[in-house]
Amino acid sequence: RQRQMCIRDSKREEQERVQKMNILFFLTPKEEVAHVEEDDTLRQVVEKLEYHGYSAIPLLALDGKYIGTITEGDLLWEMKEKDFPDVHRMEKIRITDVKRRRDNEAVKISESMEDLFEKITNQNFVPVVDDNGIFIGIVTRKDVLLYLAGKLRNH
């Protein structure tokens, strides 16, 4: 019975610790995150995805606001609809002209960890924005899982 109380107390303490944490704990800042901007071309985005080995990348406005997420699937659909354009035509297609099928939903830096965890269950990364919608970085599912795995190992 005393062991159950200790376990309950330990769980409660862990919940309180998580509630006190904030999104900055997991943030990879914008300077360390590959992203594309609204005036980039289809070719530039394809090359950036290939170079970094990503399957999705944040799309930002020129003023730094988060617009959405471009995925490999978005690019494939665009190329199919344009009859697989050659490299020269790809240079003329602005990335904002590419239809996005699904955006990674952003979280505001001021939101709760629960909001972050809810979003990260369905996305490989969660874009993080300030209260004005300016992109400040991402939180990856991998970082959250590694943190949680470390917590489990320590208990």
Predicted regions and their residues:
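Short, small-residue-biased leader/transition segments that mark boundaries at the very start
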Residues: 1-7
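Cyclic nucleotide-binding regulatory module and flanking cytosolic helices
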Residues: 8-26, 84-91
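Bateman (tandem CBS) regulatory domains
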Residues: 20-33, 90-103
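The conserved cystathionine-beta-synthase
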Residues: 35-54, 60-61, 105-123, 129-131, ...
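Short beta-to-alpha loop/turn elements within the nucleotide-binding domains of ABC transporters
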Residues: 40, 70, 93, 111, ...
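Short beta->alpha transition motifs characteristic of CBS
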Residues: 54, 58, 66-82, 122, ...
